[in-house]
C-alpha cells in the first residue's frame, strides 16, 4: 500500500489487508506514519511489514514543510515496532533542509535506542519536483549521511542513486556480502538456509 498516503483511507486498507490475510498474502504498508494510536492499534495486527518515512528529526521542519509534527510519527514507528511488525525507515535527504549531520545522526541514534541496530534505514536522494526547486541531493551528502548512520545501525542503504556503497546487505559480524544489489537486480550471494556462509551468523532476513 503506497504511492499515495494509504492511511488517508485507513478503512479501505484495513478491508483489503483482512482479505489478503485470509488468502495468506503479506501486507506491506509504506506510510508517512502520521496516524493516531487507536486506528494504528486496529490495523497493525494485519500488517506484516512497514516502511515509515521519517522526514527529519527536526520538529520545525515538520511544521514548516509538512504542516504537521514529528512526535506522532515517532510514536507510531515505536508502536509499529513494538507490535511485532517488521519495520524499516526511510529518510529523504533534501539539501539545506534536513541534510545537517547532527540532525541525520539524531535519527540514527533514535532508531538504535528505540528499535535497535538491526532496523534498516534507507537514505534517499531528493529530486526537484513540482514546486520544490532545490538542486538534487549530491551523492557526497548521501555518502556522508551513510557514514554517520552506520555508527549506530547495521543496515543502512542509499536510494535513488548509483553508489558503490549502501547497496548490498552485509553481515554485521564478518562483513561478508549476504545480498548483492545492482539497480533492480538482487541476488542472495552469501547466505544459505538463514545463515551467513562465511561466519554462520544467523541473518536478519525474513524468508517466506
Regions found by a protein language model. Give the residues of each.
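Conserved AdoMet/S-adenosylmethionine-binding subsite of the radical SAM
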Residues: 1-137, 145
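Auxiliary Fe-S-binding modules of radical SAM enzymes
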Residues: 96-208
Amino acid at each position: 500500500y503506497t504511492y499515495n498516503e494509504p492511511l488517508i483511507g485507513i478503512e479501505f486498507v484495513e478491508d483489503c489487508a483482512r482479505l489478503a490475510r485470509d488468502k495468506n498474502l503479506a501486507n506491506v504498508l509504506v506510510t508517512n506514519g502520521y496516524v493516531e494510536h487507536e486506528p494504528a492499534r486496529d490495523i497493525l495486527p494485519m500488517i506484516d511489514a512497514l516502511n515509515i518515512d521519517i522526514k527529519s528529526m527536526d520538529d520545525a521542519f515538520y511544521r514548516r514543510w509538512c504542516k504537521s509534527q514529528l512526535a506522532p510519527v515517532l510514536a507510531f514507528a515505536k508502536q509499529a515496532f513494538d507490535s511485532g511488525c517488521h519495520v524499516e525507515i526511510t529518510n529523504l535527504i533534501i539539501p539545506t533542509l534536513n541534510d545537517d549531520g547532527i540532525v541525520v545522526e539524531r535519527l540514527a541514534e533514535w532508531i538504535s535506542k528505540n528499535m535497535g541496530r538491526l532496523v534498516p534505514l534507507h537514505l534517499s536522494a531528493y529530486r526537484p519536483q513540482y514546486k520544490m526547486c532545490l538542486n538534487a541531493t549530491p551523492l557526497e551528502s548521501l555518502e556522508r549521511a551513510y557514514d554517520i548512520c552506520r555508527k549506530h545501525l547495521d543496515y543502512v542503504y542509499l536510494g535513488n542513486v548509483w553508489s558503490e556503497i549502501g547497496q548490498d546487505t552485509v553481515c554485521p559480524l564478518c562483513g561478508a556480502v549476504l545480498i548483492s544489489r545492482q539497480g533492480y537486480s538482487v541476488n542472495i550471494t552469501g547466505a544459505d538456509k538463514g545463515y551467513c556462509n562465511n561466519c554462520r551468523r544467523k541473518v536478519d532476513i525474513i524468508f517466506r
